[in-house]
């Protein structure tokens, strides 16, 4: 017999699959079933995914075994047809997968009732997919009585039922792959977009630290690129830096003094008490005076300070009109006598004027109206030695005239009481002469306080030593004196001990720790400057030199 050539594979769009046609011809008539036609129009065949490759293999092999029979020629032909059909089904599956990915859903409708049934069931599955994926196929719609059921549709119905699960699984796999695969842009696989985390705002302290670190890094980078300086350039740079620092300090000091004293409101109101030492009060007074001085008057026409013109003679010429507001009393409008300063507001008056003002039930400052104390205002005032010495230096012979006036007043008072003042004067002169000859230094209880040599003050021990070899060591180098003793007094004592002439005291200079002491420096001031915090039982060493000419 001549071998028949197998038929070619039908295209995907045919109304019946090859499996269906082969099953209808080979299957017995008892197993054939009618397949009802769908009532509603179905979608195109492209929405339907055929059964998987493994299922089609098993199905086709089973069908081919029934059709083959026992003949050898039929076996060879069936195996070739199975291979051809498997290849066709693989191509169909690839096409269907591509159509599912690209979202192709609309094509021409096919009149095949089996495809109608498949597409209708897929529509119901798509609607119920969010709720629960169906494991079993839904019930088919009722058949229409107008059409006759062909026996070929029964086997296709069975094959469609077997491949329905595979269709659902393939569709779900495609969608899962779509969700899992990264987004494709310009042929590149990009990772999924991440949600932007909220940026935390920096606090003020963090911004400050970051800016400081940036400035430091910038300075380090600039220092690396900067050329190395020579020694002269470094010294000049340090000198300029020091001048800028001093200039800045002076400006800050002037500004603080101007704000403190230049804008004071005259009101009678209580303020904070300031019980500082006398030295701090004097420093504040000096700062206040320097802040109020018009600095333009210190310069001459050539730009050189007037002080430098008279520096060799150690004198300074200045108009008294500028200094008068600082050395006159605000109560009597005269020069201050026995300067007394209010601690809180730093205004100075005469002692007698201020006490008289307090006796008339006044407890505020006469100048600014600052409240001092309700019941004891005299406890919050102090003797201002610095202002008193300034007044005596600016107004010469004023102190001597004041002493003469006091002597005359006391003599008149004693004469009014019937006391012989002439005999007392003769007796006092004789006593002073005897003390000068014998060298005694006793104080009498009936003497006035200013003749008691400040024995009631705090006492300090001073050790006087020669600073050069041409000066001798005095016989009594240890001196116990008041802390208010000045350097001029010590120089007079040394001139009497060395040359027996008090007028030569200007030939000596006093040094402490290698530093020249001013003639008006008190022992207390030198102690606070050089020996602050040390016990006063230890002597203060002061060396005397000849004046350099």
Swiss-Prot record:
Component of a PRC1-like complex. Residues 1-263 are annotated as: Disordered. One of its GO terms (molecular function) is zinc ion binding. It is found in: Nucleus; Nucleus, Nucleolus. Pfam families: zf-C3HC4. Residues 118-130, 236-247 have a biased composition (Basic residues). Residues 12-29, 145-156 have a biased composition (Low complexity). This is Polycomb group RING finger protein 3 homolog mig-32. CDD domains: RAWUL_PCGF_like, RING-HC_PCGF3. The keyword Nucleus applies. Keywords: Coiled coil, Metal-binding, Nucleus, Zinc, Zinc-finger. Residues 205-235, 248-258 have a biased composition (Basic and acidic residues). Gene3D superfamilies: Phosphatidylinositol 3-kinase Catalytic Subunit, Chain A, domain 1, Zinc/RING finger domain, C3HC4 (zinc finger).
């Amino acid at each position: 017999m001549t071998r028949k050539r197998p038929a070619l594979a039908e295209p995907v769009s045919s109304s019946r699959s090859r499996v269906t046609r082969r099953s209808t011809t080979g299957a017995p008539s008892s197993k054939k079933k009618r397949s009802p036609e769908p009532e509603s129009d179905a979608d195109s065949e492209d929405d339907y995914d055929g059964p998987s490759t493994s299922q089609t293999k098993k199905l086709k092999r089973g069908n081919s075994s029934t059709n083959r029979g026992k003949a050898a020629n039929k076996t060879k032909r069936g195996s070739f047809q199975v291979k051809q059909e498997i290849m066709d089904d693989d191509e169909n599956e690839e096409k269907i997968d591509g159509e599912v990915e690209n979202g192709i859903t609309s094509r021409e409708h096919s009149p095949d009732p089996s495809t109608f049934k498949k597409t209708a069931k897929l529509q119901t599955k798509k609607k119920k997919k969010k709720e629960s994926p169906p494991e079993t196929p839904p019930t088919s719609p009722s058949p229409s009585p107008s059409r006759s059921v062909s026996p070929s549709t029964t086997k296709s119905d069975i094959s469609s039922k077997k491949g329905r699960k595979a269709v659902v699984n393939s569709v779900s796999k495609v969608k899962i792959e779509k969700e899992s695969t990264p987004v494709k842009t310009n042929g590149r696989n990009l990772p999924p977009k991440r949600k932007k985390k909220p940026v935390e705002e920096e606090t003020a302290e963090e911004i400050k630290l970051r800016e400081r670190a940036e400035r430091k890094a910038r300075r380090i980078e600039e220092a690396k690129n900067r050329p190395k300086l020579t020694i002269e350039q470094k010294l000049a740079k340090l000198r300029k830096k020091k001048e800028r620092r001093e200039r800045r300090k002076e400006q800050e000091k002037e500004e603080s003094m101007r704000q403190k004293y230049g804008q004071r409101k005259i009101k009678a109101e209580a303020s904070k008490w300031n019980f500082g030492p006398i030295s701090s009060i004097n420093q504040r007074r000096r700062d206040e005076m320097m802040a109020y001085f018009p600095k333009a008057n210190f310069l001459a026409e050539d730009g050189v300070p007037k002080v430098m013109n008279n520096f060799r003679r150690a004198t300074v010429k200045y108009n008294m009109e500028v200094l008068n507001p600082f050395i006159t009393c605000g109560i009597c409008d005269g020069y201050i006598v026995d300067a007394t300063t209010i601690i809180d507001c730093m205004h100075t008056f005469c002692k007698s004027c201020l006490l008289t003002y307090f006796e008339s039930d006044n407890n505020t400052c006469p100048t600014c109206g600052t409240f001092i104390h309700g019941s004891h205002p005299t406890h919050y005032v102090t003797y201002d030695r610095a202002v008193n010495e300034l007044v005596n230096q600016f107004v010469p012979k004023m102190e001597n005239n004041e002493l003469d006036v006091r002597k005359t007043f006391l003599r008149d008072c004693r004469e009014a009481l019937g006391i012989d003042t002439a005999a007392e004067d003769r007796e006092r002169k004789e006593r002073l002469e005897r003390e000068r000859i014998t060298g005694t230094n006793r104080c009498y209880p009936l003497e006035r306080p200013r003749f008691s040599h400040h024995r009631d003050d705090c006492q300090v021990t001073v050790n006087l030593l020669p600073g050069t070899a041409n000066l001798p060591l005095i016989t009594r180098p240890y001196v116990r004196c008041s802390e208010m003793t000045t350097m001029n007094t010590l120089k007079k004592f040394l001139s009497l001990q060395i040359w027996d002439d008090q007028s030569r005291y200007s030939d000596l200079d006093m040094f402490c720790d290698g530093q020249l002491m001013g003639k008006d420096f008190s022992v207390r001031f030198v102690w606070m400057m050089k020996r602050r915090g040390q016990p006063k039982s230890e002597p203060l060493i002061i060396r005397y030199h000849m004046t350099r000419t």
